[in-house]
Amino acid sequence: MLASIHALLNKRDSRAATLWLGAIWSLPLLGPMLYLALGVNRIRRRAISLGVRQTVVRPIPRDLGETQTSAVENLEMLARVVSRVIKQPLTPDNHLDPLVNGDEAFPAMLAAIDSAKKSISLLSYIFDNDASGKQFADALARAVKRGVQVRVLIDAAGTRYSWPPITHRLKHEKVPVAKFLPASLFTPWRVTTVNLRNHRKVLVIDGQTAFTGGMNIRQGNVLADKPKSPVRDLHFRIEGPVVAQLQEAFASDWAFTTGEVLDGDLWFPELPDRGHTVARIITDGPDADFETVRWTLLAALAEAQNSVQILTPYFFPGNSLVTALNLAALRGVRVDIILPANSNLRFVDWASRSMWWQVLERGCRIWLTPPPFDHSKLMIVDGHWVLLGSANWDARSLRLNFELNLEAYGRNFAERMGKIIEEKLRGAHEMTLAEADARGYPTKLRDAIARLFSPFL
């Protein structure tokens, strides 16, 4: 009864509430236990996490000012909406470089770790104990021996993708490492957090250079090595004032996990101007009052005048975003959604395909990229605004996971990202409404059943 009441009062998605009520009442013992483990998706950060130093950056004034108005251009209202949703300032004068696949990202990240003189912060969802993971572990160990202050945070579930977990190797090398929200049979009091994962990817070197995006640390990202399960992905090297916001996000997660507050010039030095891109970090998670990524996406779609390009590995965004996509298309905005023809999760593919017709019939375009599986996440609006980071267009990223994205304003950077999109579209197949409707009835039924579980995927 208590589980049913909790589901009715706390589930914002009516489908999720209905499914959980069905499970609770049809499985009298197992149902409530499953709900306790997987259905409770809110946690409260310990007060210590609030003690993390506020970001030391130069916010754009409320009127944006003449210089920054030219950078934000006709997307000033989008900037204001996001400011109200996340209460984090935009920062000017940043420089961002894309790093394609582990072939480009890993050497750059390893070189940065080897160059560190004061501090290293590393947060990853998956950190495998494979060839690539061992390279990172060894580089971190070398940094510790040089006297660099190192902190490594890995999602507890993400450590289980390889055995033995990389944490064993890191601890043996005296690298300070912690697991985010660990849970096991021996810690039943943590069962309510087992479904809440930290999907963020952050590396900050000396508080001045950062890396973020969608890439985990695993060998499959290095395509030149011809791995068994290759994965294409996108990461970014970042310099400028916005690096302090990335460091603050890491410091908050580290304080929440370990109780240690990272502060002072060692972690938050003064940051020089490095470029011409206006940027801001957007953090999201089940402890936040607002679903900040969802609100950002809705605001961006409402502001779009000419074009929207979405690159995501998983796509079942929910009714509100489907409506926003369709409204943009009906206003004459060209909406392109680029997905992998087959992801690494078959059941998720089925759920996604069951709702393609909803956006195709209103004029959105869906493009399917050939193998290898593309795990990249990117959104471009009007060739001027870019959203990059860890979040996918699915219920897990938009409601359950701790995510970290970055929004960037500037035509030069958006043009560079547009070329990456163009390259992916060259070999892609455009899915039509007729094609989607031509699926056989057994396939449609299978996909529709899978979609019922989309709130949990």
Model-predicted segments: where are they?
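Helical hairpin unit composed of two closely spaced alpha helices linked by a short loop
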Residues: 304, 314-336, 340-341, 345
